[in-house]
Amino acid sequence: MSVPFDPASYDRQLEEKTVRLRELLAPFDAPEPQVFDSPREHYRLRAEFRLWREDQKRYYAMFAPGDNRTPILLEGLPIASERINALMPVLRERWEASPTLNHKLFQVDFLTTLAGDAMITMCYHRPLDAEWQAAAEQLAAELNVSLIGRSKGQKLIIGQDYVTEKLDVAGRTFSYRQPEGAFTQPNGTVNGKMLNWAFDALGERQDDLLELYCGNGNFTLPLATRVRKVLATEISKTSVNAALSNLDDNGVDNVTLVRLSAEELTEALNEVRPFRRLHGVDLKSYDFGSVFVDPPRAGMDPDTCELTRRFERILYISCNPETLAANIAQLHDTHRVERCALFDQFPYTHHMESGVLLVRR
């Protein structure tokens, strides 16, 4: 659910979110949450637009939730990065001037980074040929972007099919490949604040870390520098490949990444059954003191929640405070909330990103 874009009301909206998080965590005697705000505009590093034809022209369009028939036609998007806003009108001029680029184009996606990279994905209801490739190569060079052309069963890459982000955590710069089509944190500034909070909350450890739902290694890279070694899990092939590249690019060599779900890992740790994907991984060699979880909106399922109970410290990043509270309630008899935080990843919506550190009683 969204609320109107109104920078003048930002502080009030953030306070309302803070009150809501405070209320949800009150039953667990949680400390006052640290609050990390967002830039008021140009904070979103990615944007996806359908194209809407009107008066023989195509316009960028978005739709209100639940209404895919009434387009909101856009010249720019104030919540999107300055780079996206600069690219939008130029790209539209170019496709309007080029029948090859324009023909059966129905969607345009932008992905940018704080480090200055940009990638545009153009989606078509037709096969893409050599003529399109030549026009796209010229366009990519002119705009200084990577360009992806997509149609059914086809993906043409001009440049690279990822962008590179650089984020500073505790004085060290980490480089992240963010692949086209994979999940990335949309608010880069707040993501940097989350990484630094998690790094500080975990602290310097002499034991090992288990990470569930590691994605492209967003948290894995900085947290790996705080522990002896890390076992990280992820099920998306695209994210696994990106995470492996990111570990290599940053010289992080104490992480083992396995393609298992949280449920499968629970079975492996409980020795319910062996997994071929764990071949060569000696689970008994790990001395896990902490677990890091960043689950989907549904939160942790009961079995995964029980798995985390066996760890002294649970570092939990949540995109849904209601399911976070439900998971804490399940763990509250053995773990207390030592730290909590609100990260305003999504200004002008009711969505909240939050974090807690749970420590065994």
Swiss-Prot record:
Q: Which Gene3D superfamilies match?
A: 2.40.50.1070, Vaccinia Virus protein VP39
A GO molecular function annotation here is:
tRNA binding
Q: Where does S-adenosyl-L-methionine bind?
A: 185, 213, 218, 234, 294
Q: Which GO terms describe its cellular component?
A: cytosol
User: Which Pfam families does this entry report, sorted A to Z?
Assistant: tRNA_U5-meth_tr
What is the protein name given in its UniProt record? Answer: tRNA/tmRNA (uracil-C(5))-methyltransferase
Q: Which gene is the coding source of this polypeptide chain?
A: trmA
Q: Which SUPFAM superfamilies match?
A: S-adenosyl-L-methionine-dependent methyltransferases (SSF53335)
Reported EC number(s) for this entry are 2.1.1.-, 2.1.1.35
Q: What class of enzyme is it?
A: transferase
Similarity comment: family membership: Belongs to the class I-like SAM-binding methyltransferase superfamily. RNA M5U methyltransferase family. TrmA subfamily.
Which NCBIfam families has this protein been placed in?
trmA_only
